[in-house]
């Protein structure tokens, strides 16, 4: 029995929440114990760009990218749980990072 931590990131929170819901459903179907989804603070990266190619520094445009994150901890992961997670078809926009947290 092993602890697994899933960290999911996406630019669109709706796509992220759908992926989290499908992961939680798959884990609960196998009977594993889980904690989460835990929402992490949204990271906002802002960029300021001068509009014109030459002078006129007063004319600027601002852009931002928001990265939404969630953590799911699977406390008691069985081989069946890992197999069901591998078979899941998640959205391509969602970045999934899997870490093994050790043995119990």
Curated annotation (Swiss-Prot):
A GO CC annotation recorded here is: ribonucleoprotein complex
| Keywords of the record | Ribonucleoprotein, Ribosomal protein
* InterPro entries reported for this sequence: Ribosomal_uS10, Ribosomal_uS10_CS, Ribosomal_uS10_dom, Ribosomal_uS10_dom_sf
Does the record bear Ribonucleoprotein in its keywords? yes
**Molecular function terms from GO:** structural constituent of ribosome; tRNA binding
Q: Its Gene Ontology biological processes?
A: translation
By its UniProt entry, which Pfam families does this protein fall under? Answer: Ribosomal_S10 (PF00338)
Top-rank lineage group of the source organism: Bacteria
Q: Which family does it belong to?
A: Belongs to the universal ribosomal protein uS10 family.
The record ties this protein, via PANTHER family, to: 30S RIBOSOMAL PROTEIN S10 FAMILY MEMBER (PTHR11700)
Q: How does it assemble?
A: Part of the 30S ribosomal subunit.
Q: What does this protein do?
A: Involved in the binding of tRNA to the ribosomes.
Q: What is this protein called?
A: Small ribosomal subunit protein uS10
Organism, as annotated: Aliarcobacter butzleri (strain RM4018)
């Amino acid at each position: 029995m092993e602890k697994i931590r899933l960290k999911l990131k996406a630019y669109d929170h709706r796509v992220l929440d759908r992926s989290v819901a499908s992961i939680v459903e798959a884990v609960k179907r196998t009977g594993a114990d889980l904690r989460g989804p835990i929402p992490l603070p949204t990271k906002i990266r802002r960029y300021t760009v001068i509009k014109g190619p030459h002078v006129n520094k007063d004319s600027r445009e601002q852009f931002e990218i928001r990265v939404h994150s969630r953590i799911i901890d699977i406390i008691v992961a069985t081989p069946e749980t890992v197999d069901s997670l591998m078979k899941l078809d998640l959205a391509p926009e969602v970045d999934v990072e899997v870490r093994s947290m050790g043995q119990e």
